[in-house]
């Protein structure tokens, strides 16, 4: 009868507990954890099935809803679980944290105050730095002075590239739990990104002989990876920002934002916080067509166009110089000017002239022998005149203007 009773008791327990809960708790989270999870957590369970609810966790591990929500504040009062995330189901190995009790007794002749402090040792926070955030992984260097909160999609390489002040090897050295191949990097945890002596700004990658960026724009650092090279307007991405909110704040379309910052991905999962994103690009050439030969006097027109295109400018006999902007993406800053006898770049062709970005260029004949210009990015070595493959029209003796 005893054997039979034990059998029935075991069957009753098995019927009461869902088979999905008959598995050991994990001392380390297998999935991402939400921000704010208790730093004293000693066991975790994972929401590995869509049907898994808070009630399942509470009944499986015999914990109260109040305790569960205090250990996992991100679930909220309605206790919503995220599929695949790990949740804390025990703190301090089931022991209470530090408590202090004070008792006071008195008589008619004297007062005696007795203070009794009862303390149960709690495990140290997962951060090995006394003032560091939590949670962190084991083994983090003791002298860490800067931290980064890892989100889904981050890698060791991405983090080191984002900061630009340390190598991936250094990041792994400071955070050894991630492993040599970075497979142990956990979203929802803090990692060390600086120790005493780590630079506070990234090392410049400019060439030793260059004092000016190739496009004339000084780019702030760090930036989103693979950001377009012709960017001249930037915005700093704050933690919690999304692509749509950043684009809206900058007054640009989401499609343009994703095009200028391609590593963000269509779902914006690759957007880096604490880095600059591009919210505006510069044209290949921008210039003002001016009345006098020294770029003074009235402005006849303002022109700009993008790489890979040319532009015909009708001068109406009112242009003697071009004031070319310092910013632009023409290769090496080379601007080609083609002179045409008639408007709309027609009639006789009188050859080429060249200018550079950031230059005031006095035009051939100071504008008297042509009525239009065709402007594009090109170097002198590539033109047909230099290669003897074309012939210019005879230069007129008289002005056409």
Curated annotation (Swiss-Prot):
Q: Which InterPro entries match?
A: LysM1-like, LysM_dom, LysM_dom_sf
Its recorded name reads Secreted LysM effector Blys8
UniProt keyword terms in alphabetical order:
Chitin-binding, Repeat, Signal, Virulence
Family, as annotated: Belongs to the secreted LysM effector family.
Q: What else is known?
A: In plants, chitin acts as a microbe-associated molecular pattern (MAMP) that is recognized by lysin motif (LysM)-containing plant cell surface-localized pattern recognition receptors (PRRs) that activate a plethora of downstream immune responses.
Q: Does the keyword Repeat apply?
A: yes
Region forming the signal peptide = 1-19
- GO MF annotation terms: chitin binding
Q: What induces it?
A: Expressed during in vivo infection of insect hosts.
What is the role of the protein in this entry?
Might have a role in sequestration of chitin oligosaccharides (breakdown products of fungal cell walls that are released during invasion and act as triggers of host immunity) to dampen host defense.
Q: CDD domains given for it?
A: LysM (cd00118)
Q: Where is the composition biased (Low complexity)?
A: 98-136
| LysM domain mapped to chain residues | 42-89, 146-193, 233-279
Q: What information about domains appears in the record's comments?
A: The LysM (lysin motif) domains are small globular domains involved in binding chitin in eukaryotes. Blys8 contains 3 LysM domains.
């Amino acid at each position: 009868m005893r054997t039979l009773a034990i059998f029935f008791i075991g069957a009753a327990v098995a019927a009461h507990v869902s088979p999905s809960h008959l598995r050991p708790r994990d001392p380390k989270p297998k999935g991402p954890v939400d921000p704010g999870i208790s730093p004293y957590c000693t066991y975790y369970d994972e929401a590995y099935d869509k049907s898994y609810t808070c009630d399942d966790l509470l009944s499986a591990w015999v914990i109260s809803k109040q305790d569960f929500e205090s250990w996992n504040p991100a679930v909220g009062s309605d206790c919503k679980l995220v599929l695949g995330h790990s949740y804390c189901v025990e703190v301090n190995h089931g022991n209470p944290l530090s408590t202090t009790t004070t008792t006071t007794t008195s008589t008619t002749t004297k007062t005696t105050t007795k203070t009794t402090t009862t303390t149960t040792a709690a495990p140290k926070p997962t951060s090995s730095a006394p003032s560091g955030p939590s949670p962190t992984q084991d083994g983090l260097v003791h002298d860490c002075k800067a931290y980064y909160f890892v989100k889904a999609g981050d890698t060791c390489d991405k983090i080191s590239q984002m900061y630009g002040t340390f190598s991936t090897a250094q990041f792994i050295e400071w955070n050894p739990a991630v492993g040599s191949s970075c497979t142990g990097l956990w979203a929802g945890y803090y990692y060390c990104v600086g120790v005493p002596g780590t630079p506070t700004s990234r090392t410049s990658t400019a060439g030793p002989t260059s004092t000016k960026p190739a496009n004339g724009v000084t780019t702030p650092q760090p930036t989103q990876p693979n950001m377009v090279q012709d960017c001249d307007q930037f915005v700093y991405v704050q933690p919690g920002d999304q692509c749509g909110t950043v684009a809206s704040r900058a007054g640009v379309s989401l499609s343009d934002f994703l095009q200028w910052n391609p590593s963000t991905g269509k779902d914006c999962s690759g957007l880096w916080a604490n880095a600059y994103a591009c919210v505006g690009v510069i044209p290949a050439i921008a210039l003002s067509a001016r009345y006098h030969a020294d770029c003074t006097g009235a402005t006849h027109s303002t022109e700009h166009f993008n790489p890979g295109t040319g532009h015909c400018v009708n001068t109406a006999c009112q242009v003697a110089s071009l004031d070319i902007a310092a910013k632009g993406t023409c290769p090496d800053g080379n601007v080609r000017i083609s002179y045409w006898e008639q408007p709309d770049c027609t009639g006789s062709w009188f050859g080429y002239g060249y200018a550079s970005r950031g230059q005031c260029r006095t035009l051939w004949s100071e504008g008297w022998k042509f009525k239009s210009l065709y402007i594009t990015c090109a170097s002198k070595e590539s033109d047909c005149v230099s290669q003897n493959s074309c012939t210019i029209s005879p230069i007129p003796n008289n002005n056409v203007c």
